[in-house]
UniProtKB/Swiss-Prot annotation:
Binding, ATP: Q88, G106, E107, G108, K109, S110, D494
Family membership noted in the UniProt record: Belongs to the SecA family.
Function (record text): Part of the Sec protein translocase complex. Interacts with the SecYEG preprotein conducting channel. Has a central role in coupling the hydrolysis of ATP to the transfer of proteins into and across the cell membrane, serving as an ATP-driven molecular motor driving the stepwise translocation of polypeptide chains across the membrane.
Entry EC number(s): 7.4.2.8
Species the sequence originates in: Malacoplasma penetrans (strain HF-2) (Mycoplasma penetrans)
Designated name of the protein: Protein translocase subunit SecA
Cross-referenced InterPro entries: Helicase_ATP-bd, Helicase_C-like, P-loop_NTPase, SecA, SecA_DEAD, SecA_motor_DEAD, SecA_preprotein_X-link_dom, SecA_SF2_C
Membrane topology: Peripheral membrane protein
Keyword Translocase: yes
Record has Protein transport as a keyword: yes
Catalytic activity, reaction form: ATP + H2O + cellular proteinSide 1 = ADP + phosphate + cellular proteinSide 2
Region described as Protein translocase subunit SecA: spans on this chain: 1-1099
Amino acid sequence: MHMKIKKFKKIKKKSKILVKAKLIAQQVENNREEYSALSIEDLRIRTDYLVDGLAKDKFTLEDIIVDALSIAREIIYREHGMLAYEVQMMGAYVVHTGDFAEMYTGEGKSLTLLLVSFVNALTKRGVHIVTVNEYLVERDALFAQKAFEKLGITVGYNTSKLSKATKKEMFARDITYTTNSELGFDYLKDNMVRDINEKVIRELFFVIVDEADSVLIDEARTPLIISGQPKEDFSLYLDIDKFVGSLAEDDYKIDNESNTIALTDQGVSKAEKFFNLTNLYSVESAEIVHKITNSLVAHYIFANGKEYLVKDDKIYLVDQFTGRVLEGRSYNAGLQQAIQAKERVTIEPENVVMATITYQSFFRLYEKLSGVSGTAMTEAEEFLKIYNMVVVRIPTNKPVARIDKQDYIFGTKRVKWNHVIQEIVNRHETGQPILVGTASVTDSEIIHERLTELKIPHEVLNARDNTKEAEIVKHAGEKGAITISTNMAGRGTDIKVSDEIRELGGLYVIGTERHESRRIDNQLRGRTGRQGDPGESRFFTSLEDALFKRFATDRFEKASQKLEEEFYDSRFFSKMLDRTQKKVEGLNFDIRKNLMDYDHVLSLQRELIYKQRDQILLKTNNLNIINNMIDDYVETEILNFKNNDNTSLVDANKIVAFLNEKILKFSYFTPATFANMPILLAIDKAISIIKKVVDVKCKILEKINGLNVIDEILLVNLDQKWTTHIDKMTKLREGVNLRSLEQRSPLNIYIEDGNNLFERMKINVVTDTITSICNLSLPNEMIEITNALDEFVNSEEFKKKNYGNQREIEQNFNSALSFSGSATSEFDNFIESELENTLIEETPEEYVEVEEYIPQQTEPEVVETETTPYGFEIPKYDTSGTDKYELNNGSSEVNILENESDIFENSFSQIQNTFNTEELDPQETPHTAKADDQFVFESANLEDDIEEIENVSNIDKAPEIQQPLSEEEIQKILDMPAFKDDEKPLTIGNYLDNILDSMDIDYDQDKEITQQLEPSSNEQEVTANIPEQNQLDITTSDIDNEIELLDESERESIKEEIQKSISFDLSNDPDFIEYRNSVFVNKNNGIDYSDYKKLNEDESDDDIKAFYKLPKVDKKEPGTLFGGNLLKKTPFNFKNKNELDNEKIKSTNLFREENQASEQELNTLLQLDDEKDRLEKINQLLNKEDPEVLERKELERQVEFETPVYYLEDIPEGESLDNFKAMDNPHEEQSFEDNLVDEENQQLEFEEALDEVIDDGQFNDEVEAAELSEEVLEEVINPNPEELSEEDKWLITKKEHEKFMEKYLGDVKELTSENPEVVTALLQEKNKNLKDVEIIENNEELENTNEEEPNINSQDSFLNNIKIIKTVDKESEDETEIIQEINQPAEIHNLQKDILDYLKENNKK
């Protein structure tokens, strides 16, 4: 069979993406005047309209991109005074399209992310912004929150300190800032939960990765691992550490290029002697070999201060790319224990992997992935192949003025350090600030010690102490500052310089060693010369640096001869460094690509497991899942019960023993029931019997409310078997390279064996689940099962299950037998089409052949046939050739490994390349989320100036197979514009090599330095041309020139693509105008809450199904293991309950404030006989605004809108809004002006009457002023209490207030002065998240305390609404000041009550 060659359509050049971005940015700039004239309310209305239109599919994000960017730009400018540059809007557009924007350091990437996150947040599906540390997460989230929440776009952040409930609330917001590791671990924990409501992440819609090259490239080799269930045995570690420590250099060999280590023959002999072994590499010694390998790495490859730190009797990992300590991480597979033994710290038990995922697999789960960084062009090919992102370089806002000088090369580190210190001293004397970048903590401490000896002040920022990171970096640009730092990638704080420093030449950056990647060097250089500032950089390297030792050994001797005590900065050494770095980058890419290929197999299995867990957690279809499992279980078991004399019949004794002993646990069936029964019919009957038994058990459980036991059994068995499967897959991965002697690709072997392991895991899950259910001991189960079986076995349905369908059964069975181990499971169907195209290595033939199934297996030979009693022939196969794994251990004996779990669990060549780290779950609580794999594997590259490939939109379909191409078709392919004349392939094989491997695209823009440089002395400085890779020479004017160079058709093509985005005019859109006129608008609120949905706390199954919007499916689905409804949407698409409740409270308060008290409230007040109840009701009414303020608001509202305002709370239950509007409105009986005159007269009359009552002394001081009797109201205020106006009532409360305060205020002051700790204690009790006591004003800061917003009408609400803006002190006078600020009678009353209750509880007088 031959693979059909995909003809990729021609698409635009990379520069055309920039052209489109600039046209969009220009249109946003054109809208500046219009949007700057809008009020906040107008911006909010436009935002709400865009949200509503997207939800109803009126338009797409592409249509409204210009207006959305205009809104975001304007609100950010108003709140922060920062107006986005044109280049930032261009970057936002590139990121929005799902590509990679390379923005030079200091060009405002954070603001760019704000713009694009707002645009995509309009979908209300959640935007995740990933940054490199938690400090930046909180800083940027608060920055965004201030601007966007005024427009109804919520912003949250996710850090390791947050509780699970808070994380869930944060992820429910429209924009969530998080770190990459925390996001990945939350995803894994979500897929280990036992309750679906414990999941914190909603759908994986759109993620923007800041410093994406660091996250997606540098950290791609480090899987995220959650471990648990520790293994107890670690006694061998100290013995092995002692042995490894005694080895000589001849006993082991280090491959510097791959950074691996292994014992030599001499070392193997020593090991066998030390451990008293006959053969070190026998299967029995596998564990010892594994631990020796780890110990070799710990002793001779890893070093304290570089890969890890020893602190407080613990091992802390160090991020090799940023120099930060990786909190909560540890090496897995025993390497952590080997390091602990080496450093003589406490050895912790080795852990079992419970969940794992790589960043490559995780981020491809998102529907849309994009990234930004200052250095990505060198890895453009990898971003395209792995993540399907085109790297687009964004022009700088101002020309780059930094000077990158030629490297200084030294022969030894000793000479290098001397020159580095001398350079620092010389520059420090001029006052120029200096930033020194080192590759390790050890190097930074060497410079620190030397400068300390010279008494030169400086700051050190490394993994040992990074608590003051932001502060240190902030002052690094001041005069005379010297900052020594490990890798500066992702530090996130701009180093700003003053005019004085600019005169001195700006910040001077010294690199003390070239890194493995040119990107890391460029990131260090990029710390100076931001936004057109002057700056300078130079690297000091020696031939003893790690980069030379590992990767330039062939040139080391030649280079050493050129250097003695002097240094050179010649073209020879510069080119050697560049070639060496390119070599390392290529090697690392191969490692990451290899890791991705292997991880893709596991990720497909992971997706099926996680989807199945979701089905179980939903609890809507678990009985159907059980029934599917029974089908698989019975068939697997009973196929082993063939009659020895006639294999087409079942062995009656075996099947009876199976049913009575394993299923029923009591004797019921006899061999006569299954005598002379064909095995396939026996399977059918046994399935019916077991389903009936399980059905009876479920009915019993339902009676005792125990159906959740079934759910728990399903989850426990699935989780346990999945954990075991991960462990087996890890061992298979580590040992698969040892089987290369089979003359097969290790990857193909891994695919085949991994698939077999997964099939075995499924069988084990089914077996253990059904067995566990049948083993449940329930009340009266024997009687009920017996009665049910009697009825079922004697039924006509059971008796009529004759052999009428035997032909169909046997034909299906024959067909099933024919594959003999071929991939036919749901899992295989799910992954085969992808594996064929993406994972199977290409053959070197001219035509690429793809086997129809994976793994490739030979169909067994038919040796004979048998005839059934019903005349059908069943073939018998020769199964003697069943695969077993053979391992030649070097002895004459060949060990047979019966299953994959016995394969070597050690790796002699791979463990050092992928030093996995893991996060230990301290609670060991099993934690699931939708695992939609949006894996898009692009099998072609993008020619830099030629074309991009078409996205692969359907990865589930198998490739089409067709006959070899004709010469004419081949010629058409060769004539495609994707190839230049000199790149035309000669054969189809070459063509596929170019498409599937590489077009030799040179994304590296390095210019060769042709200037010959002579050796220079300390006094002489040599300046070379700046390499193009270190500067952004593209400007916006270049893009204009590019547009001019385009022909008319190309120009029109670009404009046509974005015409809809540019021409969309929101202001003149008829739908928007209608929306604006119809929507309820108020200066304080512009939201209609009628469309919001929420789930009640006690959700029913129907609620959950509606929430997930699941289809009704009763049969197996191809996306799961055992069936169930396939998830179509991820949970938590709606706002969380707290947010909805808060919005409801705000809406209710608005109604109460605008309408004051309702007639019903007033009548209730007047009819209360009990004085205490009446006082409480009045206190509630007093929690309202001044009536004069309300009157003014009402006047403004009426004048502005000239129509009555209807509130949701006004509408009776079941009544429509239109009908409600048609009702009589009492406020419309008179004109507004007439009402004002009448109300004014009533107020004057009322005030006079009330003053007379007070002056006559009708109020008794002994009686609290608020307790107005019904008689007083009737006699003084109005002869008819029911006609009392709202204004009169408010005047009553105003007068009450003055009298009320005099008595209560004194009582409370006295209580608090005698017990000064009371207020503080009460406040801390109400808000446990505050250490001292942070006073909250008007609930504006309440969200930061993670507390629900209180109901303002609740009696204890006062303590959450104190109107003081300072921290509570323990001093009594400060507390007195607090009380004086409280000016509401209801608050005083509640405070006094709370204080008295507190004193009573604490037995104080």
